[in-house]
Design a protein with these regions (language model features):
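N-terminal secretory signal peptides and thylakoid transit peptides that target proteins
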Residues: 1-17
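C-terminal helical cap and adjacent loop that interface with cofactors, partners, or active-site loops
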Residues: 13-14, 47, 230, 243-262, ...
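N-terminal Rossmann-like dinucleotide-binding module
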Residues: 13-82, 159-162, 258
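Predominantly a Rossmann-like dinucleotide-binding segment in NAD(P)-dependent oxidoreductases
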Residues: 40-48, 149-154, 159-271, 276-282, ...
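N-terminal Rossmann-like NAD(P) cofactor-binding module of classical short-chain dehydrogenase/reductase
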Residues: 103-104
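N-terminal glycine-rich "phosphate-gripper" loop used for MgATP/nucleotide binding
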Residues: 107-109
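Beta-strand-loop-alpha-helix segment that lines the small-molecule cofactor/substrate pocket
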Residues: 113-161, 175, 413
């Protein structure tokens, strides 16, 4: 995955991609399969490959034609799952193919934007794992490119395809909660061995041969150049050069659905806080983190998560008339991953609530975790219909505003102010 685009020259480089790459895009017939490539074949890439294969098994309207990965052992393992697919180390070589319709991007965060932009310029639709990009500036470039090329982009926030958030949106719009003034959520867990401390193959590296070879220079791309570091390669989420830590990995999952439930708008003010309170393994990203954002629609969203305590705040939408209590979406303590929500009236409105509904609280069924497959199916459905997917580029961009600025707030010790277009006023 070689990339010569520097951070400083990112916008100019993105604008010039179309001159270097010939635009193509097949027009799919009713019986045509969506020719799909997977770029990045670590844990998440293999998970998404499985979802694509499930789609193929159920609908037979797609096929995986190409796989790309810089670590040879991962590439070989994935190739065994898809015997007919051609393998690549360089994504640029993969994108020279004339038959591609869709690209699934499952690399570390710092590669999301460069590969997505290159795929869009080739006329491909893109499913990109969350976060949409590594930085807010990159997200603005990507959303502009999606519009310019009239492509489909799905950001990998599975919950945006669940029935849960469509029901929540309907309840919010019905006025049952009154004016929603605050939302809170969490994505917490407790790993005493160190979250993201995935297994390391000590034999793997840039000097190794065969299956153990890693093309470290390509993996680094535009990130700061350094000697090979196995911890950075196998556990990239621990380091700022390749990830935003809890914010980009976990909070993105919570903030995007809140944008669906309320309004999809850029926040007006963002702060991030927390710290590296427990882990002492050389990581840079905090093990406990809070994202807080105010919005032009006059409400606030807070997401508080930890990797060393699983009891995060309850998932709530707090209105002037009632509060909606939702179960945790992912992980957390047993018993909180419920598919049932409760709407409980505020004390001053309890009598009116009882008169209207005939009960002192409303139980909402079927608002739990619907899994991952619906989101991948939504992407392929939209590739064919040309309708906007559930976590489209505009949603991904506006969510990225809150996510990236919370990281910058934490790292720079400042609160960021944003205008309605997403421009950071004091950045």
């Amino acid at each position: 995955m070689q990339n010569n685009v520097t951070r400083r020259g990112f916008v100019c480089g993105a604008a010039g991609l179309s001159a270097a790459l010939a635009l193509h895009g097949r027009i799919l017939g009713a019986n045509d399969r969506v020719n799909t490539a997977i770029v990045g074949l670590g844990g998440r890439g293999n998970w998404l490959l499985a979802k694509v294969q499930q789609r193929i098994a159920e609908k037979n309207d797609a096929q995986v034609v190409a796989l790309c990965e810089v670590y040879q052992a991962r590439l070989s393992a994935a190739a065994k799952k898809v015997p007919g697919a051609k393998t690549y180390t360089l994504y640029q070589e993969l994108l020279e193919r004339k038959d591609l319709d869709a690209v699934v991007v499952a690399t570390p965060d710092h590669w999301h934007a460069p590969i997505t932009l290159a795929a869009l310029d080739r006329g491909c639709d893109v499913y990109c794992e969350k976060p949409m990009t590594h930085t807010l500036d990159e997200a603005a470039v990507v959303v502009a490119k999606v519009r310019e090329k009239n492509r489909i982009m799905q950001v990998g926030v599975q919950a945006t395809s669940w029935n849960r958030w469509q029901k929540v949106r309907e309840i919010v719009q019905s006025g049952t909660l009154g004016k929603v003034v605050a939302c809170q959520g969490t994505y917490s867990r407790n790993d005493p061995n160190g979250d993201w401390n995935w297994p390391i193959n000590p034999a793997a590296g840039p000097d190794a041969l065969g299956e153990n070879h890693i093309d470290w220079k390509q993996w680094l791309g535009s990130a700061p150049q350094r000697s090979f570091d196995a911890d950075r390669f196998f556990r990239f989420r621990k380091y700022w050069d390749y990830s935003g830590g809890i914010a980009t990995d976990l909070h993105y999952h919570i903030l995007a659905p809140f944008h669906i439930a309320l309004e999809n708008e850029h926040p007006s003010r963002v702060a991030g806080m927390g710290g590296l309170w427990v882990y002492n393994d050389g990581r840079e990203t905090p093990d406990t983190f809070l994202t807080a954002a105010d919005y032009p629609g006059k409400y606030s969203i807070t997401i508080q998560s930890s990797q060393v305590n699983e009891i995060g705040p309850l998932m709530l939408l707090r209105g002037t008339h009632a509060t909606m209590h939702l179960g945790d979406e992912w992980e957390g303590p047993q018993g909180r991953n419920t598919s049932v929500a409760r709407i409980v009236p505020e004390t001053p409105f309890r009598d009116d609530f009882l008169k209207k509904w005939g009960k002192d609280e409303i139980i909402v069924e079927n608002v739990g975790n619907d899994g991952d497959q619906k989101h991948m199916d939504n992407f392929f459905d939209c590739v064919r219909s040309r309708q906007q997917p559930n976590c489209h580029a505009d949603l991904g961009h506006k969510v990225m505003t809150g996510i990236d600025l919370s990281v910058r707030s934490y790292r720079q010790n400042k609160i960021f102010v944003v205008d309605s277009t997403g421009h950071v006023m004091n950045g």
